[in-house]
Amino acid sequence: MSDTPPQNNTPMDNGPIPTDVAERPFVYAPPATPVRVIHKDDHLLVLAKPSGLLSVPGRPEEHFDSLKTRVLKDYPDATIVHRLDMDTSGVIVMACTRAAHRHLGLQFEKRKLRKSYIARVWGTPAEDEGRIIAPMRFDWPNRPKQMIDFEEGREAITDWEVMEREEGITRLRLKPHTGRSHQLRVHLMSIGHPILGDTLYAHDDALHAANRLQLHSETLRLRHPKDGSWVTFTDPCPF
């Protein structure tokens, strides 16, 4: 992205902005695709999570299969530091020691990491890049959905830039400055460009334009718990 401040694409409505997408049935069908190890050392375990797999097990017995439960079979000391949405694929990091967990947790809490995602969205933005500033909170009557609320929401900021324009579809690189649940999905929906294949926030045409959520955690840059040096981990986008 350029050094100039990106355009502010914040929704203009200052009141709560819920999603108007009707609830869709959900059946958990975790993929057989194995969790791939990107990097392993005495402090970090960096993985490539497949789309459709929960990061941690859910309460129902049928939601037990998850990245965490699969990984613990081979790496019993690994602990979850952050999560990716079930349908999001890509880079996720786990800690191998208590000290590493604290170190990584503080980086997430204080927003010291750098994350970038790839998404394919419905429509073609007029600009080549932009910034979305739109506070978010739970949409309590419709959980697990989230919503934008300028009065009661928590700060949420997303930068985006166009990578490629197709016919009626655009490939974006997304750089979140905050880590709210469903942030990228809700922010893009709010400016009229829902992510393709999104069962929670996309209208029917955008939902059926892809066979999975078109959102991928491509790059995670962080300070290594061992010595504080910057390290970057990447998982190539599968779509």
Model-derived segments and spans:
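RNA pseudouridine synthases
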Residues: 2-239
